[in-house]
Amino acid sequence: MICLIVSSLNNTPVGLHGELFKEETIKQIADIMKKKEIEYGHEIYLLSDEPYRELIYSEEKYPFVTNYYDNSLVVYSFSKSLSLPGERIGYILVSNGCKNKEDVYAAIKGAGRTMGFVCATSLFQPLIPKCLGVTSDLSVYKKNRDILYEGLSKIGYEAVYPEGAFYLFVKALENDAKKFSEVAKQYELLLVPSDSFGLEGYVRISYCVSTKQIIDSLPIFEKLYKYYNK
């Protein structure tokens, strides 16, 4: 058995930069995996990590991978959609079309018992059914995104325009994103270098804070920009 884990590549909106995977992309991934299953002569399982599924700013909906590939599993967390970071509550969905699904389901249950620290608390288990379909106020995220993206672009920064999630992926003002992040700390700006995600030269900024914080940060980002463009 081979298990192909596609997490940050196949969650959408992508947690790294907030872009959406289109249906055609999902179809291409599914087609490749089906061909490889035939080539290798056994199942390949696709694990799709989707904690940001509801955090989309348009009417566009992300296609479920289970509709395109039978041997797929979907991992979901309510911590993002309900803005409850750190709460260990979510689910793993095993496709009805998944081969050996009973064995896969049993393995998941066994892993949950073995790693007790990931078990859902008794407090949240009865609450979650009441939260299905509910999300945080996305209008706040959308407003923050627009203010931050437009503000940084006006200053001179280059950034990926996010279609979902709550992160802005910004090109660092020098090749070394880690060093750039250290310099930003001197201006009381906390940035996450993209090296941690396997891509160099960018930083990630979370905008799930108050709108006032976003507005107040722009003059500081401008000072940082001027430091690099003396």
Q: Residue spans of the language-model regions?
A:
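PLP-dependent class I/II
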Residues: 1-230
